[in-house]
Design a protein with these regions (language model features):
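ABC-family P-loop ATPase nucleotide-binding domains
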Residues: 3-59
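Catalytic Walker B motif of ABC-type/P-loop ATPase nucleotide-binding domains
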Residues: 72-76, 81
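Helical segment within the ABC ATPase nucleotide-binding domain
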Residues: 86-99
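Conserved H-loop
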Residues: 101-109
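A short, surface-exposed alpha-helical micro-motif characterized by mixed small hydrophobic
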Residues: 113-115
């Protein structure tokens, strides 16, 4: 699970957080996590309280993607990541999630991450409003996934 806000102990060293994940999660690959952290230039001797929101997000993404989970829940995975780093983060997610797993992403930044989507679930007031293949939605409304969703919402509002 990748929350949209940090749940990490602020004063704990990154190296200790990695060790904690190694203890708690049998599917956690500490070496892989250290490699992912290195791609973001996150030192093991840092603490979350010394990091920006974007760096904490990258730390949490590294921790989550170093697992071989069957289900990944990502809540706004690039919400705090600067624009320049977003493509790198998305590539990292695509390259490192368990191919036998399922990824559920909650986001408002559809344009930035639509290449990750196979299917789209639209919730309205806590209920599933739409559940369809991304390609089907694009074909029905044309354009990008974001444009298709906007067209769908306009159509529903006109009813």
């Amino acid at each position: 699970y990748l929350p949209d806000s940090s749940c990490l102990p602020e004063k704990m060293l990154v190296s200790d957080i990695v060790r904690l994940y190694e203890i708690f999660f049998a599917d956690f690959d500490a070496e892989k996590c250290r490699e992912l952290l290195a791609t973001f230039a996150i030192g093991l001797s840092k603490t979350p309280e010394e990091m920006s929101k974007g760096m904490i997000d990258k730390l949490q993404i590294s921790l989550v993607m170093a697992r071989r989970a069957r289900l990944y829940l990502l809540d706004e995975p690039i919400g705090g990541v600067d624009v320049e780093a977003r493509e790198h983060v998305l590539d990292l997610i695509l390259e490192n999630f368990n191919p036998k797993g399922t990824m559920l992403i909650v986001t408002h930044l559809i344009h930035d991450i639509e290449r990750l989507f196979d299917d789209v679930i639209v919730l309205k007031e806590g209920r599933v409003e739409t559940f369809t293949a991304s390609d089907s939605l694009r074909a029905q409304y044309g354009g990008s996934l974001e444009e298709a969703l906007k067209a769908m919402f306009r159509e529903e509002a006109a009813r």
